[in-house]
């Protein structure tokens, strides 16, 4: 029996060691490139620092009326870059380390509506500079106040009632000094519709000042057991008209004689823009009972007209 043998090729068995290692070297190189590529695609995350804001303070100057406020959140910026809007207390991550200029604005519910939150234009921001390091937690309690340029006119009821009856209605508006019905100080305003009666409409007959095109807000402390509206009675060429700015929901229940006080910021800018030629703007409040068997009780205090 004969076996056929292939001719012996010495070159196959005498390759240099470097050629034998080529596949292994290629594998290692490819692996390194893949790992480096992962670092490029998914770079190592920065280690953040944190800004902790547990609360805030607010104070109006002596000539700016009450320090009552309804600030609901803070708008936070680092070097003019927004970090977000936060309810308090808040722990806020900061990725850009080093020296940072922190600016914090006070936010409110415009017209008392949760879905229309804004930076209140008349509250000055809180500013500070921090040197920020990774894992560091800096605690800030921002202090807010009105801008000095804000033009503020406040009316309370310490000196008596300034609302007068207008039109045909059978409600009443007076002043209460009963301690458990007064918001602050010694007196608050009290609107009342007795059982079986149907309508309250009262106005402040002082013309309210504002500059066209500027922000215009009415701040107010209130308690009510019935829906009521706030707006302007305008006079143009001897013709008067009633312009609703906001319809306000009840804050209390039952007969409303135990007030549940709230603070609201009412944006009057839009209403005023609809009446650019009016000579007079008089603030009014109005209410119609939802239930004729339940008396209506509306308590007001610190009506603050704020503009520039």
Please report, for each region that a protein language model flagged, where it lies by residue.
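Extracellular carbohydrate-recognition regions
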Residues: 139-171, 298-304
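Structured interaction patches on ligand/partner-binding surfaces of diverse proteins
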Residues: 110-141
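Extracellular beta-strand ligand-recognition surfaces/modules
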Residues: 220, 263-298, 303
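Extracellular ligand-binding interfaces
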Residues: 217, 221-269
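Short carbohydrate-recognition loop motifs
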Residues: 173-200
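C-terminal motif of bacterial Sec signal peptides marking the signal peptidase cleavage site
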Residues: 34-37
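Extra-cytoplasmic beta-strand recognition segments
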Residues: 157-158, 204-228, 266, 303
């Amino acid at each position: 029996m004969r076996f056929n043998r292939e001719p012996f090729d010495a070159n196959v068995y005498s390759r240099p060691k470097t050629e034998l290692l080529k596949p292994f070297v290629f594998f290692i190189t490819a692996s390194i490139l893949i790992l480096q590529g992962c670092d490029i695609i998914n770079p190592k995350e920065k280690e953040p620092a944190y800004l902790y804001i547990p609360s805030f303070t607010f104070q109006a100057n002596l000539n700016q009326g009450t320090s009552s406020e309804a600030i609901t959140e803070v708008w936070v910026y680092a070097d003019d870059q927004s970090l977000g809007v936060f309810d308090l207390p808040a722990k806020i991550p900061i990725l850009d380390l080093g020296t940072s200029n922190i600016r914090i604005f006070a936010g409110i519910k415009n017209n008392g509506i949760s879905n229309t939150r804004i930076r209140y234009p008349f509250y000055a921001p809180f500013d500070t500079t921090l040197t920020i390091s990774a894992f560091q937690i800096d605690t800030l309690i921002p202090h807010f106040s009105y801008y000095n340029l804000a033009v503020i006119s406040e009316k309370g009821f310490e000196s008596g009632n300034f609302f007068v009856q207008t039109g045909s209605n059978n409600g009443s508006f007076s002043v209460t000094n009963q301690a458990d019905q007064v918001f602050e100080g010694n007196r608050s305003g009290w609107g009342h519709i007795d059982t079986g009666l149907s309508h309250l409409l009262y106005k402040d007959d002082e013309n309210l000042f504002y500059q066209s095109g500027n922000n215009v807000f009415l701040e107010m402390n209130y308690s009510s057991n019935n829906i009521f509206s706030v707006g302007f009675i305008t006079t143009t060429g001897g013709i008067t008209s009633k312009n609703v700015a906001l319809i306000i929901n009840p804050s209390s229940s039952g007969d409303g004689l135990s007030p549940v006080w709230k603070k609201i910021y009412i944006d009057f800018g839009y209403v005023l823009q609809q009446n650019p030629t009016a000579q007079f703007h008089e603030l009014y409040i109005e209410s119609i009972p939802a239930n004729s068997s339940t008396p209506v009780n509306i308590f007001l205090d610190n009506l603050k007209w704020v503009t520039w």
